[in-house]
Amino acid sequence: MAEKQTLIDAINDRFNSQIEAVVAGVDMVTIELLPTHLLEVCTTLRDDPPFNFELLLDVCGVDYLEYGMSPWRTEETPNTGFSRGFEEVIQEQIIPWNKPRFAVVYHLLSLRHNHRIRLKTYVEGDPPLVPSVIKIWSSADWYEREAFDLYGIVFEGHPDLRRLLTDYGFVGHPFRKDFPLIGEVELRYDAAQQRCVYEPVSIQPRVLVPKVIRVDSRYEKGEKENG
């Protein structure tokens, strides 16, 4: 706990005017900052002796669309198929959200000090834009490509910002909250044409009710006797 507070004090002293907030979580410290200060703060966190966060562990995107409005919205499924395990959210529990829809999260590790830290920056625009940190940590290469592919977040300055997990002809970004669960189109190989072709999605949306198996003690004795 003392080490965490020491790190927080060092962050506040060094980045007083460059960060929006410092949150002391259970697992690690989180810094919230604007994209305009991202590169400067990241460079300092990597190079300055009190920090020495020389290792970038992960970069990921977050979509806060409808955050705090509903715990589960899948075409009214909670009111039908999942009603037995679903509780309605009362109006007082709705969380107001006044920040941008998308955020980029960075996880850093200091091998010298054995510290972990999380950076979070909220990004705006269509598409959402944020500077690439690949010149600070080369390991950001594929992490940023993944976030671009799945969320449509553009990392300015990335030398090779291509899709990573979906095919290059894919339309949309599948981890966005408004992307259809069944997708837009499906891809298959056509042997006659000897190439891959796109077709309308053949999956039909439907409500799936989980099978519930209950053990009824009234019949256990009879089953044992028959067995």
From Swiss-Prot:
Disulfide bonds: none annotated. NDH-1 shuttles electrons from NADH, via FMN and iron-sulfur (Fe-S) centers, to quinones in the respiratory chain. The immediate electron acceptor for the enzyme in this species is believed to be ubiquinone. Couples the redox reaction to proton translocation (for every two electrons transferred, four hydrogen ions are translocated across the cytoplasmic membrane), and thus conserves the redox energy in a proton gradient. Transmembrane segments: none annotated. This is NADH-quinone oxidoreductase subunit C. The gene is nuoC. Belongs to the complex I 30 kDa subunit family. Its EC number is 7.1.1.-. It comes from the Bacteria. It catalyses: a quinone + NADH + 5 H(+)(in) = a quinol + NAD(+) + 4 H(+)(out). NDH-1 is composed of 14 different subunits. Subunits NuoB, C, D, E, F, and G constitute the peripheral sector of the complex. Keywords: Cell inner membrane, Cell membrane, Membrane, NAD, Quinone, Translocase, Transport, Ubiquinone. GO terms for molecular function: NADH dehydrogenase (ubiquinone) activity; NADH:ubiquinone reductase (non-electrogenic) activity; quinone binding. SUPFAM superfamilies: Nqo5-like (SSF143243). Gene3D superfamilies: NADH:ubiquinone oxidoreductase, 30kDa subunit. InterPro entries: NADH_DH_suC, NADH_quin_OxRdtase_su_C/D-like, NADH_UbQ_OxRdtase_30kDa_su, NADH_UbQ_OxRdtase_CS. It is found in: Cell inner membrane. It is a peripheral membrane protein. It is an enzyme of class 7 (translocase). GO terms for cellular component: plasma membrane.
